[in-house]
Amino acid sequence: MVRGSILLVMIAFLGGGSAPPPTILAGPASYADLVVLALGAPVVVRATIAKAARIAPDQAAGVAAGSARVLVKATLTTAILAPADVPAAIEYLADVPVDIRGKPLQLKGADTLVFLRGGAGGYALANARGQIGWSAATEAAVRRVIAEARRADPVITGVGNAFHVAGSVPGEAESQFFLTTADSKPVSLVVLSRPGEAKRLSVALGEVIDEAAGGVAKETLLWYRLACFLPRVLPGEASGDAALAADYAFVLQVLGPCGRTLP
């Protein structure tokens, strides 16, 4: 998967006077970017681009070099998220790259997922990069994010308290990290070490901390909120405890990088 900015990729084709094929809109650079798009848009649709007309440069302020602003007209395929009915034809502005001739890439016919704000009075992209290529896998991931968001799981803001306790036998130990959340819901991470066993991370979403609690599945909303919003080092006095610091480093290693590139 391409990392960094969301790119528009042109399919190579042979000349001969025929119209060029549509530009294929790439998907997001990471799962985290997909979460940013899905959570930041009150309207999410799948649509086919029918037309993309360039806006005159003197009427398109703030367009980055190498890009052009176009008025996109698209035909609705399906509404994935919408507070009200979405019309069969929608319009919105988008900034897209230009080719070597300075012309916007060909978008007509592109199958796309669009993340929008607005309503019957008109739509706008909820994120400057809120127009991405459709695929069954990407749509399924968007639907999962939206469904998980409706469960109102805690929004992680940082680490509160932490402690480390050695076990009764050499090599046995447990570290617990109590996280802070936007709504004060309890969340804790437990790192358990036992002789002859691999170190294990589990997460507890509640007051009760159970050794049987599960781990953190990748590419879930909980994983995103942990991987992208936990600090890189322990705050306060906990950072001076070598055992706690080592187990916290293990937490970050298990979670892996956030991968978010979108604002």
Ranges and model annotations:
Residues S5-G15:
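Bacterial N-terminal signal peptides
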